[in-house]
A protein has these predicted regions:
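Canonical alpha-helical transmembrane segments of integral membrane proteins
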Residues: 234-243, 301-315
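Catalytic domains that recognize anionic headgroups
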Residues: 287-291, 295-298, 306-345, 349-361, ...
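Helix-loop-helix
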Residues: 1-287
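Hydrophobic alpha-helical transmembrane segments
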Residues: 32, 146-163, 336-346, 405-418
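Transmembrane alpha-helical segments in integral membrane proteins
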Residues: 46-53, 122, 159-176, 345-361, ...
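Sec-dependent signal peptide hydrophobic core
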Residues: 34, 112, 413, 437-441
C-alpha cells in the first residue's frame, strides 16, 4: 500500500464502506437499485443530519459575526495601510473576541461535504450493479441519463435539475449574506454541474436527492415551529412507506416486511421526540456528566486496535499459509495494515469528527456509548461465535454462518448486562476508565504484535520452502512406456458417483476402463489424518502414526508424501509432484521436502492458472473484508448474519467484469459472484491438457496431483456445471428434481451446501473427462494407469444408511476411489470393500518390481497388507497448527467390517481416546 492508499483508507474508504453497506442492504430488501439509491440518500442524510446541523450553526455564527464586524473591518482597511492596518485589525478582532482563523468555521460544511462527495463518487460511479438497470425515465443508471435530445444532441437533464435545486437552496440560505459568500456557493453549484455532467445517472440521481434534502432542510430552518412540521411530515412518510411496502410493493417477504415496518417506526422518532420534549428527562447523572475527551479517545483507539489489529491478526496467525498465493504474492501483513487503517479512520477519525462537533451534553453521552461499545465488542469477540467451522482464505465459512434463536437470546441478554454494567461503572468511576482502556489498548497491541511476528516468521518459511522447479508447471506422459497417475480430489464424495453418471451419461464413455469402488472408506475424516495412509499405505494409518510417538506428525506426513515419488524415482520413472498436500504442514506445500531428490520435479499449481487481474480483485476484496469480518465478530449475534451476508460482507461490486471476490448465495439455487478459492483449483483441472507433455520415448512416468475443486463448495450454473457471475438453477432443479434417486437409493439434496458440493463434484469429473479425451487423442490413455480418489468424504447427512445411532455420519469416511488399469475397457462398478490406504498398492502393482517403502524397507503389496480390521479416526481436529504433536489429538475410533452401507458393520471402539496400532 502506498502513502496515498493509506491516506485514502483512513479518510475516504470508511465512508465508502458505509455507503456500500447501506446500499447493498437496502437493495437486498427492496430489490430495485433505484429505490436503493433513494434509501441510501435518506439514510446518509439522516445519519449526518446532527453533524450538518452543528456545522450549519457554526457557519451561521461565523456569518453573523462577519456581518457584525464588516463595517469596522471595511473602515480600517479603507483608512489604514501596511503594518498599521494589520495592527488595527488585530486590535479590533481582539476587542470583539474574534480570531481570523474563525473563518474556517464558515467552511465546516464544505470540509464535511468534500469527503462524503468523494466517497459517494468512488462508490456509485463504479458500481457494476447499476449498469443496464432502468429506473423511471432513466434508461441506464450506470450511464449518463441522456433524457433529452435536441437537434441530434443528447442532453443530460439530471445534472441541470441537480444544479437548479442547489441554486434555489443557495438563494434561500445566503439571504442577507455577504456577496463573497454567495459567490462561493454559486461557484460550487456550477462546479458540480460541470464535474458531474457526464457521470452515471445513478450518481447524479443520488446527489440530486441530497440537494433536495438540503433544500427542504434549509426551508424548514426558516419556518416557525419547523421541528413540529418536520416531525409530522416524517410520521406521514413513515406511514405511507409502510402501507406501500406492505400492500403494494411486489411480493411480500419476511425481510421486506421487517424492513418497511422498521423504516416506518424509525420515521416516527422525530415526532415522538417533539411530543416528549420537556416531559422525559434523562437521569441526572447522565445529564450532568461532563464530557471526557480522554475517555472518548481511549475508547475509540481501543475499538480501532481490537477490530483493526487483534481480530485480523488472529485470523491470519491461525493459518498464515491460507492467505498466501505464491503466483500473485502479497504479504498477509498488508491485510492487517488495511484493516487497521479502516478501523482508525472509522473509530478515531470519523467518530472523532462527530464528537468534536457535538454539544457538551451529547459528548458526555458519546463517552459512555463508546465505553459500553468497548465492553460489548470484546465480549462478543471472545465468548460468542467460536465454533463456526473452517474459515476460507476468502473469509467465508464452509458451513455458513448460522445461530439458533437460543444462542442469539443468550447473547442479547449478555450484551444488555454488559451495557448496564459498563454504564454503572461510568457513573461511579468515570475518571478511572481512560486508564483501564489504556491498559486494554496495550494488551491488545501486544497480542497483535505477537500474532504479526508469528505471521512474518511463517511467511518467510513458506517463501523459502515453496520454490518449485521454475517455469510453467508441466509433466510428461510416454506414448510407449507406462504411465501412472494418482489424482486426489480433496473431499470428493464417493457416494455421488451413481447420481453424477446418471445425470451425465457421457461420462461413462470418457471414463472408459475405470472401475468405481462404491464401498470405500478413508482412515480419517480430515485431510491431515487421512492423507498419510492414502499416499503411504498401511504403515501410515492414524493408529500406526500414533504408535511412532517419538516423531512429530509433520515429519510423518512428509515421509508419507515421499513414499511413492521416491520409490518410482528409484525405479527409473520420470516423476512429477503437483501440490503435495500439507507438505511441511503448510497450506502452501513446502516443496523442500523433496530437495534430496533432484530428479523429482515439483510444482505448486493452485492459483497458477488464474488470471492475475482476478487474483488482484480477490486481494482488494480481502483488504476490505478483514475489517468487515472484525466488525461482524465484535457485533451481537443477532446482526452478524446481516453483516456477513453469505460471505460477501455486503460488497456492492461483488460481481464485476474484471474480477471475482467470492460468492453470495440467496437460498439454495441462486447465487452471485465467483469464488476465487474455487477458481484457483478449478482452473488447474481445466488446464491439465495444457501442461501435459506427450513424449515418444519409452521412459515410464509417474504424476501425482492434489486438487481442491471438490473441497470449496460453490453454486455452479446447471446443466453445464460451470462458474458464472449469476447462477440461477431454479428451473433446472424443478425439472430434474428426481435425479437424486438412483437404484432405489435417495440422496438428500435440500440445503445450499448439498447442491454446492454435488455441483463441484460434477464439475471436477467433467473437467477430468475432457482431459481423458485429450489423452486418448494423443495415444497415451490405454498405456496409463489412473487412480482418482479422495482423502475423505463429508459430514453431510445425505444418506440415512450412513447415519449411526450414536450420531456418527459415516458419509465422512465415504471417500472416492476410481481406478483405470492399463488397456482396461468399459466402465464398471465394484462393491469390493476398499480402504484409502489401498491406493499405494494399486499404484505400484506390476510396474515396480520390488515395491519397498524406501524409508521403512517394508513391502507395499497385497501379501504384506494387514489382515486385521483397521481403526478409523473420527476427529474434526483438522488444523495442523493445533493438531501437530507426536500423536493425533484424542478422538472417536471406529472399525467397519466389510460394508460401509450396513449400519451393523460399524463398531465404536473408543471415544475421546488416543489409540495406537499393536506392534
Amino acid at each position: 500500500m502506498s502513502f496515498w492508499d493509506i491516506l485514502g483508507t483512513l479518510l475516504i474508504k470508511p465512508l465508502q464502506l458505509l455507503f456500500e453497506v447501506v446500499f447493498v442492504m437496502a437493495n437486498r430488501v427492496v430489490g430495485d437499485p433505484g429505490l436503493a439509491i433513494i434509501a441510501l440518500s435518506l439514510a446518509m442524510n439522516f445519519l449526518v443530519l446532527p453533524l450538518y446541523r452543528r456545522a450549519d450553526a457554526m457557519q451561521e455564527e461565523e456569518r453573523e459575526t462577519e456581518l457584525r464586524l464588516h463595517k469596522g473591518v471595511a473602515h480600517i482597511k479603507k483608512t489604514f495601510r501596511g503594518d498599521e492596518r494589520m495592527m488595527m485589525l488585530q486590535t479590533y478582532y481582539r476587542q470583539n473576541n474574534y480570531k481570523p482563523t474563525y473563518v474556517l468555521k464558515g467552511a465546516t460544511s464544505l470540509f464535511l461535504e468534500i469527503p462524503f462527495f468523494i466517497a459517494a463518487y468512488a462508490f456509485l460511479s463504479n458500481l457494476e450493479l447499476l449498469h443496464g438497470v432502468s429506473f423511471g425515465p432513466i434508461r441506464d443508471l450506470g450511464a449518463p441519463d441522456g433524457l433529452l435530445t435536441v437537434a441530434g444532441v443528447t442532453v443530460n437533464v439530471l445534472p441541470f435539475l441537480m444544479t437548479a435545486i442547489n441554486l434555489v437552496s443557495c438563494v434561500i440560505f445566503t439571504k442577507g449574506s455577504l456577496p463573497k459568500t454567495k459567490v462561493q456557493l454559486y461557484t460550487m453549484a456550477l462546479f458540480f454541474l460541470v464535474f458531474l455532467y457526464t457521470s452515471p445517472a445513478g450518481l447524479v440521481f443520488y446527489w440530486t436527492l441530497n440537494n433536495l434534502f438540503s433544500l427542504i432542510k434549509t426551508i424548514f430552518y426558516k419556518l416557525r415551529h419547523a421541528h413540529i412540521i418536520l416531525g409530522v411530515l416524517f410520521s406521514l412518510a413513515g406511514i405511507t412507506a409502510a402501507v406501500y411496502g406492505l400492500f403494494f410493493y411486489g411480493q411480500p417477504t419476511p425481510r421486506r416486511l421487517v424492513f418497511f415496518i422498521a423504516a416506518a417506526l424509525v420515521l416516527q422518532l422525530p415526532l415522538l421526540a417533539v411530543l416528549c420534549k420537556g416531559k422525559v428527562r434523562l437521569p441526572e447523572k447522565l445529564c450532568g456528566a461532563q464530557p471526557s475527551k480522554k475517555l472518548f479517545v481511549s475508547g475509540s483507539v481501543f475499538l480501532a486496535v481490537l477490530t483493526g489489529l487483534l481480530i485480523p491478526s488472529a485470523v491470519i496467525h491461525a493459518s498464515p499459509q491460507e492467505f498466501v498465493n505464491m503466483t500473485s504474492f502479497l504479504h498477509p501483513a498488508w491485510y492487517i495494515v488495511s484493516a487497521l487503517c479502516f478501523a482508525v479512520g472509522t473509530f478515531v477519525i470519523w467518530f472523532g469528527i462527530f464528537y468534536s462537533l457535538a454539544k457538551p451534553s451529547v459528548k458526555a453521552l458519546l463517552d459512555q456509548c463508546v465505553w459500553a461499545l468497548c465492553g460489548i465488542a470484546l465480549v462478543d469477540y471472545m465468548f460468542f461465535g467460536r465454533s463456526l467451522g473452517n474459515l476460507s482464505a476468502g473469509l467465508v465459512f464452509d458451513n455458513g454462518l448460522q445461530f439458533t434463536t437460543g444462542q442469539m437470546l443468550v447473547n442479547l441478554a449478555v450484551v444488555l448486562a454488559v451495557f448496564a454494567a459498563f454504564t454503572f461503572a461510568a457513573s461511579k468511576w468515570r475518571q478511572r476508565i481512560p486508564g483501564i482502556l489504556t491498559v486494554g489498548i496495550i494488551a491488545v497491541v501486544c497480542m497483535s504484535v505477537v500474532n504479526t511476528v508469528g505471521i512474518c516468521r511463517s511467511i518467510n518459511e513458506i517463501k523459502a520452502g515453496a520454490q518449485s522447479d521454475g517455469g510453467t508447471p508441466s509433466f510428461s506422459l510416454s506414448k510407449t512406456g507406462k504411465n501412472v497417475i494418482v489424482l486426489m480430489l480433496d473431499r470428493a464424495m464417493g457416494p455421488y458417483i451413481p447420481y453424477i453418471f446418471n445425470e451425465k451419461p457421457e461420462l461413462e464413455a470418457q471414463f472408459d476402463g475405470f472401475t468405481y469402488y462404491s464401498n470405500t472408506a478413508s482412515l480419517g475424516i480430515k485431510t491431515n489424518i487421512s492423507t498419510p495412509s492414502l499416499f503411504g499405505g498401511y504403515e501410515y494409518t492414524p493408529a500406526e502414526l500414533n504408535a511412532r510417538d517419538q516423531e512429530l506428525l509433520v515429519d510423518k506426513q512428509n515421509e508419507a508424501l515421499k513414499v511413492l515419488p521416491v520409490m518410482f524415482d528409484q525405479n527409473g520413472f520420470d516423476v512429477t509432484v503437483l501440490e503435495p498436500v500439507y507438505a511441511g504442514y503448510g497450506w502452501v506445500p513446502d516443496l523442500s521436502i523433496f530437495q534430496d531428490y533432484p530428479d523429482i520435479r515439483r510444482f505448486n499449481v493452485r492459483g497458477y492458472f488464474s488470471d492475475p487481474k482476478l487474483q488482484k480483485q480477490a486481494i482488494r476484496s480481502n483488504k476490505r473484508n478483514f475489517f468487515c469480518y472484525a466488525l461482524m465478530k465484535a457485533a451481537p449475534l443477532c446482526i452478524q448474519a446481516n453483516l456477513y451476508d453469505y460471505g460477501t460482507y455486503n460488497q456492492g461490486n461483488f460481481v464485476s467484469d474484471d474480477g471475482y471476490a467470492g460468492q453470495s448465495t440467496d437460498g439454495a439455487l441462486t447465487a452471485s459472484g465467483i469464488s476465487a478459492g474455487f477458481m484457483n483449483s478449478y482452473n488447474v483441472l481445466a488446464n491439465l491438457p495444457n501442461i501435459t507433455q506427450i513424449s515418444k520415448d519409452d521412459t515410464n512416468t509417474y504424476m501425482v496431483l492434489t486438487n481442491d475443486t471438490t473441497h470449496d463448495p460453490v453454486l455452479l450454473q446447471e446443466p453445464e456445471y460451470v462458474p458464472a457471475p449469476e447462477v440461477d438453477n431454479t428451473q433446472y432443479e424443478r425439472e430434474h428434481a428426481d435425479r437424486f434417486t438412483v437404484n432405489g437409493r435417495t440422496m438428500t439434496v435440500e440445503q445450499r451446501n448439498d447442491y454446492a458440493y454435488y455441483q463441484c463434484n460434477v464439475a471436477a469429473l467433467l473437467q477430468l473427462g475432457k482431459w481423458f479425451d485429450y489423452l486418448r487423442e494423443n495415444g497415451v490413455y490405454d498405456n496409463t494407469r489412473i487412480i482418482v480418489m479422495s482423502d475423505h468424504g463429508g459430514t453431510m447427512g445425505q444418506f440415512p444408511e450412513l447415519l449411526a445411532d450414536d450420531g456418527m455420519d459415516a458419509e465422512s469416511f465415504a471417500s472416492l476411489l476410481m481406478v483405470k488399469d492399463f488397456n482396461s475397457k468399459g466402465f464398471t462398478t465394484s462393491d469390493e470393500f476398499m480402504l484409502s490406504a489401498d491406493v499405494p498398492l494399486l499404484a505400484v502393482k506390476d510396474v515396480v518390481a520390488e515395491p519397498v517403502n524406501p524409508f521403512s524397507g517394508r513391502r507395499i503389496d497385497e501379501v504384506s497388507k494387514p489382515k486385521q480390521e483397521q481403526l478409523l479416526l473420527y476427529s474434526f481436529e483438522w488444523d495442523v497448527n493445533v493438531n501437530c504433536g507426536t500423536q493425533f489429538i484424542a478422538g472417536d475410533w471406529y472399525t467397519v467390517n466389510g460394508d460401509i452401507w450396513n449400519k451393523n458393520a460399524w463398531h465404536s471402539v473408543a471415544n475421546k481416546a488416543v489409540l495406537t496400532a499393536e506392534r
